[in-house]
Amino acid sequence: MPKTKLASSVELSFEEPELFVHMYDFAVEITDEFCQIAFPGAFHPAFLLVKLYHILLSVISMGSIIYFFLNYSNLLAFHFNIKILFFFQFCSCFLQSATLAISQTHHLVLALIANGPCDVILAPALFALFNLPLIFSMLCMEFSQVLMVIERTLASCLFVCYEKTTKTIGFVLTSFAVIVPGLTCLYMYYDDKFNYPQMSAMATSPSSKLRINYIFITINVLNVLTLMHSIGLYRHNKQKINMVKGRDHFILSSRFQMNENVSSSKLLWRLSCAQLIIFLLYGCAMYSLRIFLPGERSAVWQAVTEFCYTPPLYCAIMPLICIVCAQNSLKQRNSKVQSLITLRSVGQEGWDNYQGMLQKQWE
């Protein structure tokens, strides 16, 4: 609730919106009555708790990403082309988390020190400064996932010569991972002046709402296709490596790459599954709120809307999935090394093992 004011401060609070209007050219007239109707949740405890939740989640996400880079990034022995896309998605998640943490901290402090309902309105430039990185980083997370699946498809189909190729494919795909989200943001906001009063960086400008809906529908379709393709890619690589498992004369580099294709495609379908669930949950939540909570936006409606902003969940889950995959990869590697160490090399048993290896080599 807004703080209680004396008569003199009440008079001042009615002047503040007037000063704000003269300072910024908003699309609508800013009055206390408008702010109380448009932003009923500005001082609601549930709304403030959601902001605190996003701050904590973002801090945890950034900490998890840093922890992964320091302790587990070297355990994923991937080709440069997939690794650069993989790290680009981590950077996108870090940008999403950092922007969300800063913006929500600003909104929380602003709500706590505000004297009136119009004090929580963001300046147009500040809203754009917070909103654009959130949208851009979210699109980068999505398109980098699609491009990683494309890269693994090329690696699986061209596994004989892919190791000999240069890093050009990785740089080209990473450039697309930046350019496509940038052009998408340009399409979404090319005529948006960011002059509609907003109290949250996650709000949608009325002039861009329809185009944003189209983009999110496209993202959900891409998530479904990416998940299906990544699962098929994993099964294909698994079958391929099973076919050559007993062939010791198979080229070592090709066998290593096939093992890499299996581990990377397995990680990709797990990430794609998490991304699909989280982004689909976000879209379903938004449409459900519009259906089941129609009419004027109450304080609870605004709190639930912010709570349903689920992309930060992916930023928190992605490092955990990668850490688990890296640990499993390390265990499998140690298990294979241990099995070779325990193989007898002396006596009759050692001679039998040696003959068996020679026989497999010449088959």
From Swiss-Prot:
Any Pfam family the entry gives:
7TM_GPCR_Srab
From the Swiss-Prot or TrEMBL record, what is one GO molecular function term? transmembrane signaling receptor activity
Please name every pair of cysteines joined by a disulfide bond in this record.
none
Predominantly, its location class is: membrane
**Membrane disposition:** Multi-pass membrane protein
Q: Which UniProt keywords apply?
A: Membrane, Transmembrane, Transmembrane helix
Question: What GO cellular component entries does it have?
Answer: membrane
Where do transmembrane segments lie in this chain? 46-66, 75-95, 120-140, 169-189, 214-234, 273-293, 304-324
Q: Where can this protein be found?
A: Membrane
> What processes in GO biological process is this protein linked to?
sensory perception of chemical stimulus
- What name is this protein filed under? Serpentine receptor class beta-17
* Similarity section: Belongs to the nematode receptor-like protein srb family.
State whether keyword Cytoplasm applies: no
Transmembrane helix found in the keyword field: yes
